[in-house]
Structure formats: structure tokens, C-alpha cells
Amino acid sequence: MGKKLLEVKDLHTSFFTANGEVKSVNGVSYYIDEHEIVAVVGESGCGKSVTQMSVMQLVQSPPGKIKSGEVLLEDKNLLEYGPRSKEMQAVRGAQIAMIFQEPMTSLDPVYTVGNQLCEVIRKHRKCTKKEAWQIGVQALADVGIPDPESRMKNYPFEMSGGMRQRAMIATAVACQSKLIICDEPTTALDVTTQAQVMEVLQSLVDKFGTSLLIVTHNLGLVTRYADRIYVMYAGRIVESGTTEEIITKP
């Protein structure tokens, strides 16, 4: 494993409702090394997704609030930046990318996949439209989409669920993100497509040295791919270790 890429220290995130404070993330700490695949697993509602939204500073405020903690990306505390700051916007996409559960809600249905991909590429890589198009085509090819040139001209509704998810992964590849946070990336897909998407994610680590953080409730899915696993329950990390330790000696 490489050096530490991301470290979260004692993170606290709460939601303030009419019935009082709900501590969704309650003192969570974890780390990810370079070129490593780490999984955060837990039941629905345990706070695993809110933890990653806090890392990206995407928690809606109000009612949510990141109360305390540190999110260190290569020793820089991201929580010192405002959610709308130029520094944080530069981190999102270029250094940390996030792939959500349902790609149809992440892709705009009225723009082609190519237009959306090129917009992100031009923002983070400062290139011409022609260069961005070529980078986008190569990114689609890298994630296993056949005939990427024509697929760039497709609208999201013209692609299958697995193909749309690959297009979202291609966005992270095109931006050369150091870390990809995958929030339930295969839940909305059938079993065969789940395996294909996971193989694509695995290939990113092997080919580009990307680090992956996989958030899921499916322990069986990550046992094949993850180097280490964190188990969350009720807003806390209750167990951590290598995949072998978690599976054989919980």
C-alpha cells in the first residue's frame, strides 16, 4: 500500500429537526491509502452515506451541519474550506469524485453524455472543446463502453443502467481523480451488471492507481474487492480490519 491519501478524524454531523438533534455521524474516523480499495458497510440509515457527503461538504444546511472533526486530504483539512469555496470546488471532481447510487439522477436527461462529460473535463483540466471530447472518448473506452465515439452523442435515457453508471465512472477517470467515493454504486443494477461495474472499478486501481471507497450494505459484494472494511452502526464505526479479518474473525 502507498502513503495515506485521505484521513477522517472524529467527524460529527447532525441534522436539526422539529423533534431535536439527530446525530447522524457520531465520531467517525477512518483512512484510505493510495492505490487501496476500502469499503464502508452497514445497514440502511447507519450514517455511511452522510459520512461521505460530509467529506465532500455536500450535506444540505439547514437542516444538516458538520459540527466538528477533520477531513485530511494529503494533510490538508478540507473542512477549513467553505462548501462553496473555490478550493472545495477544485477538490470535487479533480481530486475526489463521487459516484451515486442511481446514475439517472446524476446525469441531466436533456444533454448528451458527451456534453456533460466535456463540461466537467474542461472545468478541471483546462483544455479546448476538441481536446475535452477526445479525453471523454478515451475515458468511455477505459471503462469498457463499446463504440465510445457514438456513445458520447447518446442521451442518458438511451443507455442502460449499467452503461449510465460506467459513464459516471468515466467522468472520474477523465478528471484523473485520486479518490473515487462510490455510494452504493451497484444497488440499482442487476447481479450480472453489478459484477461488471465492480470489475471496472477494480481495473481503475490497477491501471491508474486510483483509490476507491465503496459504500454499501452488501458485505458479500465487497469481500472480493476490498483490502479493508469498516463496519458502521448508528453513526459510529463499530468494527474495522482487513477483509479477511472481518469475514473470518468478526
Where are these regions (language model features)?
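ABC ATPase NBD Q-loop/coupling interface
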Residues: 16, 70-90, 199, 245-246
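Conserved ABC ATPase "signature" region
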Residues: 76-77, 131-150
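A short, proline-enriched helix->beta-strand linker immediately N-terminal to the Walker B motif
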Residues: 174-178
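Helical segment within the ABC ATPase nucleotide-binding domain
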Residues: 195-208, 220
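A short, surface-exposed alpha-helical micro-motif characterized by mixed small hydrophobic
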Residues: 222-224
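ABC ATPase "signature
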Residues: 240-241, 249
